[in-house]
Amino acid sequence: AARPLARLYGLPPEAAPAVILGLTGGYPVGAATVAELLQQGALSREAAARVNAFCNCASPGFCIGLVGLGVFGSARTGAVLYGIHALSALLTGLVVARGPMAQSAGGRAAAAPREGFASAFCGATQQAARTALTVTAFLTVFSVLLRLLRPALRALPYGDMLAGLIELTNGLDELTLLPLTICAQLTLASFLLGFGGLAVQFQARALTAPFALPSGAFTLGKLLHG
């Protein structure tokens, strides 16, 4: 799968794990994989910024279970939403990732020295813990923020829709409360899944922050994916 993805997007084959894991693992696995590839020296900052712009996706389980069954009462609806979501991510990549890659001798980070099993296992465990802590922290902060803003949002037309732009899960839970047709609700759900909400976006940014990736492509990618 690595070489077809590389040819399609003009990215190095080493970027393929971020795309595949991002599409299957859910938020923010794509960003975590990009950070790991940067740490290993497998990607340049330019390639990492390009793939990071479209590899942060909802998982099939999230779309089918939480959105399909939980919100719309239909696993089939969730599966269709995931298919649209995944296809939109891949199409977004054609916009934000294609183009000539700058050739720079110093473009890649220095590869980390090979580690023994014990060291690698400890490092992977610590990284997983940091990722889980980052996800939990941003979910907590934005859930509290949304609770504080709830009275003001409900005073606005379609304020419940704005909730999803802040914290995705809470916004999706309230979709069926909106006075919209089912078609409009599904369209809005698809947009929110692609955009991810600010909580998801900040999770991804936090994981790649040590590498100072340019943010323009990421912002454009989330808007286009939505």
Annotate each predicted stretch with a short phrase:
Residues Y9-F72, L162-L177, Q185-F211, L220:
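Alpha-helical membrane segments and immediately flanking helix-loop junctions
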